[in-house]
Amino acid sequence: MSPRFPLATSSWDQAEYDALNRVIESGVFSMGTEVQCFEQAFAALVGSRFAVMVNSGSSANLLMTAALFFTSNPALKLSRGDEIIVPAVSWATTYTPLTQYGLRLKFVDTDLETLNYDLGALESAISEKTRALMVVNLLGNPNDFDTLRALTEPRGIVMLEDNCESLGATFAGKQTGTFGTVGSFSSFFSHHISTMEGGIVVTDDEEIHHIMLSLRAHGWTRNLPKFNRLTGEKRDDPFEESFRFVLPGYNLRPLEMAGAVGREQLKKLPQLIAGRRANGALYQSRLANHPRFMIQREIGESSWFGFSLLLRPDKGESRADFIRELTVAGFECRPVVAGNFARSEVMRYIDHEIHGTLANADFIDSHGLFVGNHHDPITPAIEALAAL
């Protein structure tokens, strides 16, 4: 039986099905004009110069990491062995592309209120070895980018932004995902927009954009403009140029259907975010002082991917009992992203160090969970939480 209050619901209507039929009737299924139009619309919406669509948010993280290894700009270029600071609480594929490219991960603790970086711990973790910072805006909540910029810019630290859970969030009027040199987004079913599967990388750097266009499709030059920052001027012989490989690339291309659906979803995005924020306002007003659990403190304007609940430490409650209580009440729930990822079994394969104790991340891992937010009103769900 389906839960009364699921983690995610569809935001599709007839417009998305019509878009799918439009692609089917065209007979063009692999990446083409629909994807290009989606990329242009997405870049304009978030205020970035360039957007590259891929087949998942995980692929978006892979692509943006890889691009920084091939840039000719020494201020942005990463190399194997470089140290990158990462938050202890995030999703698996925030981290795996970094280790696959040979970076050394330094895990830093999370703030119990915002669920983003503990800024004091972050500042103390930065050293002369620190080359890059991975910023994750968790569950729709922006980081304090004023502080992050003050910590990174004077030191020449490259900022990457995993914004897969936070499309539509803003800090000081600027869209999250656009603060870093590169930023990733996801359009998986449960996210703010859904293209079935999908992801996007944005950047203002033209060379990185061209590198990503090549890496996305086999490392070839076929999708590059004639005059580009990667190869200079392309040759006029399409027979040769269509099969010219210049980078060790992948196949991360999205389907044309994903681009077509994405175009329709972007038209709805303002109302989708507005609906989530209305629910978020009620969540804060009804649950901010709940005696049993703590909720996430908003920074800037969150786009409220989901609603976190952290059992208060002085109550001594069991999360397992709380989950059973939520399940009986009709809630589908899950861990806060992947919990403290530094405690995962996969860490034996990852070159890393841990800064400090990660005490907050451990607490989130053992006492935290989240329930779903949606674009439609969910007053009964929030009132049911308030009554617990």
What is each of the regions a protein language model found here?
Residues 161-195, 210, 241-244:
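Conserved active-site segment immediately N-terminal to the catalytic lysine
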Residues 1-28, 33, 244-246, 372:
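N-terminal "arm"/small-domain region of PLP-dependent enzymes with the aminotransferase-like
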Residues 28, 32-83, 97-101, 107-109, ...:
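Phosphate-binding glycine-rich loop
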Residues 70-163, 170:
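PLP-dependent aminotransferase-like
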Residues 35-40, 48-51, 57-58, 120, ...:
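PLP-dependent aminotransferase class I/II
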Residues 185-186, 199-205, 234:
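Short beta-strand-to-turn element immediately C-terminal to the catalytic PLP-Schiff-base lysine
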Residues 195-199, 262:
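Adenylate-forming
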Residues 85, 106, 159-160, 184, ...:
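Structural detector of well-ordered beta-strand residues that form the stable sheet scaffold
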